[in-house]
């Protein structure tokens, strides 16, 4: 039976393999990444423009249910912006006090699909929204995970659907002696993050 450490190493190796496969896809789809910019070859970009659905046709063929739900989707934006603001302030003030490395927002909130030439303006706005919102959820989860490691690094008894990055460091549920002995060490152990720069 594999240990937890072995499984984590296996996951890291699979993530590295996935990254290598994604880089191969970049070559197949004629683009490369320079810093934070994605650059397509000119021929690929020209071809993409021919595949774009223009706005009038896009609206004409949109399903009614999609049109009717737009206000509900966009109503989520204000609470999301507020949460982004509050948690950024929280980690800016509290994490240095707790000696927790800050979460780099740009590692989670990635907005780049608006540069795709085969998307019309509505699709680009939708992609900006989804990139922001999903990235924000990852950013918030990482802030919460680091705060949880500091305040309550105990695994749950029940299975959790989506384990965050810090969960592997937590103490077992019901391990009272381990909690008393190891809490302070675990609370302050962010050694695996010390190479990450601040925002």
Located regions from the model:
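Cysteine-centered metal-binding/redox modules
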Residues: 57-199
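Compositionally biased, charge-rich terminal segments
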Residues: 31-76
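Short, non-transmembrane cytosolic segments of multipass membrane proteins
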Residues: 1-44
């Amino acid at each position: 039976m594999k240990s937890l450490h072995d499984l984590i190493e296996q996951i890291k190796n699979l993530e590295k393999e996935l990254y290598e496969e994604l880089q191969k896809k970049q070559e197949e789809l004629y683009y490369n990444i320079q810093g934070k910019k994605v650059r397509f070859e000119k021929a690929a970009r020209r071809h993409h423009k021919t595949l774009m659905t223009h706005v009038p046709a896009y609206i004409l063929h949109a399903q009614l249910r999609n049109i009717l739900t737009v206000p509900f989707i966009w109503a989520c934006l204000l609470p999301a912006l507020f949460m982004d603001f509050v948690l950024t302030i929280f980690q800016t003030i509290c994490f240095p006090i707790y000696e927790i490395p800050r979460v780099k927002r740009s590692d989670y909130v990635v907005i780049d699909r608006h540069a795709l030439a085969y998307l019309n303006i509505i699709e680009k706005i939708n992609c900006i929204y989804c990139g922001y919102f999903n990235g924000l959820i990852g950013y918030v989860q990482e802030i919460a995970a680091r705060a949880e490691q500091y305040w309550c690094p105990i695994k749950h008894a029940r299975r959790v659907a989506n384990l965050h990055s810090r969960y592997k460091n937590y103490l077992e549920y019901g391990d009272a002696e381990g909690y008393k002995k190891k809490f302070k060490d675990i609370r302050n152990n962010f050694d695996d993050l010390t190479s990450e720069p601040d925002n």
